[in-house]
Amino acid sequence: MGVGCSVTITMNVVTSYTIGIIGGGQLARMMHQAAIGLGVRTRLLASDPDESAAQVMSDVVVGSHLDHDAVMNFAAGCDVVTFDHEHVPTVLVEEMEQAGYAVRPGSAAMVHAQDKVVMREFMAREGFPNPAWKVCDTPDDLVSFGNGHGWPAIAKTSRGGYDGKGVFKIDGPDGVGEPFDAAGGLADGKQPIRILAEEFVDFRRELSAVVVRSPSGQGAAYPVTETIQRHGVCAETISPAPDLSSDRQVELQTMALDIAGRLDVVGVLAVELMEREDGSVVVNELATRPHNTAHWTIDGTETSQFENHMRAVLNLPLGSPALTAPVVVMANVLGGSEEDLTGALQHCFARDPELRVELYGKSVRPGRKVGHVTCLGNDIEITRRRAHHAAAYLMGEHDA
């Protein structure tokens, strides 16, 4: 155990290491699936024994990612620790490192996904594309920002938000109190919650540049993906992003790899982008873990983001991110009226034998990510229709 963790091979047999995953969601579940093929043991810290990953893993510790003793005791039983989410307090990640545990990604990288203000400061300092932004200490500061940059303005809590939570579109001075009220509800006394104001970017679409980086500095870049959001949640991805030239693909991939290198990221880094009408982009958010916008890589590339994340964590050479089809479309299954997901598969598979489905073992409730479907093809619109039908049917829309 320790910071030098890497897989060794003796007489053609991989010496098995234990990767600890903090967080029991579907990302951990799919990391575990990737680790099986590598002959690597996984250990899970989950808040509930019925969480998605806990259902399929044998070595499960039930405990909170906010509990100091639970996290430190868990790390002691692992060769290297990685994450299903960014919600472990930064101070706890730092303490694991100080105790000599191998943590990948490390706290210095991960904080840029945990704290939006820290991320914006880094982007500005390093010259990456930011929207206009300002840290607001008071509602009056937010009024001043909106008056200066125009309404509507976007206000975000610096920590605690995901899938559109913690993000507020403020139409005018009368609405500036809401984000400050939300920040008060998120405060835990351990980490400051600040309000970040950003200009409202009138973007034409959202893109995602997902890369992987190993401790030795090797990088791999997946094709840039167009993402379609509904109610702040990713509903669909199209890969590679349509109407994006090869040169522009390379530029955005290179930028994402550059960010990963400067932050010393180990594992997956997702760079969420907003593309304006003129083709320019600004960085929206970062994620230092496998990402929903790259679930399509399980079936649509030679090496999935999950396997490459596991490889990076173990300092193994990274696998090829090359496409396995000209067009790959993923559609999320967002909980609807269909409770018998297994029964619905009979229709979906009979209709489309090439359909790929991942269900996460989660109970169904409106808007909740309970799975995704992936379709590979040659024509964008035909492939999208296939994915839309399957996802809609699994959500209970049987007339789709």
Which residue ranges define each predicted feature?
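ATP-binding N-terminal substructure of ATP-dependent carboxylate-amine bond-forming enzymes
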Residues: 4-121, 140
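Active-site "cap" helix and flanking loop/linker of ATP-utilizing ligase/carboxylase catalytic domains
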Residues: 250-271, 277, 287-336
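Active-site nucleotide/adenylate-binding loops and adjacent lid/helix of ATP-dependent enzymes
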Residues: 112-208, 212-259
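Peripheral (often C-terminal) accessory segments that flank ATP-dependent C-N-forming ligase machineries
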Residues: 5-7, 11, 311-400
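A short linear hydrophobic-aromatic micro-motif
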Residues: 132, 152-154, 193-198, 269-270, ...
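Short beta-strand micro-motifs enriched in acidic
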Residues: 212-214, 274-276, 360
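Protein kinase-like catalytic core scaffold
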Residues: 220-223, 269, 281-285
